[in-house]
């Protein structure tokens, strides 16, 4: 899993070969927290 920001978004996402899953989230977002274990499953 890669943490994205302005400096690497284009290279890691827009220029990536293949499929990329980008998860936008916030520590205060309860639905985001609920999905996080499933996002980690994709990483494996």
UniProtKB/Swiss-Prot annotation:
It holds the Pfam family Thioredoxin. InterPro entries: Thioredoxin-like_sf, Thioredoxin_domain. Transmembrane segments: none annotated. Keywords: Disulfide bond, Electron transport, Redox-active center, Transport. Residues 2-44 form the Thioredoxin domain. Disulfide bonds join 29-32. Gene3D superfamilies: Glutaredoxin. Participates in various redox reactions through the reversible oxidation of its active center dithiol to a disulfide and catalyzes dithiol-disulfide exchange reactions. Belongs to the thioredoxin family. This is Thioredoxin. The gene is trxA.
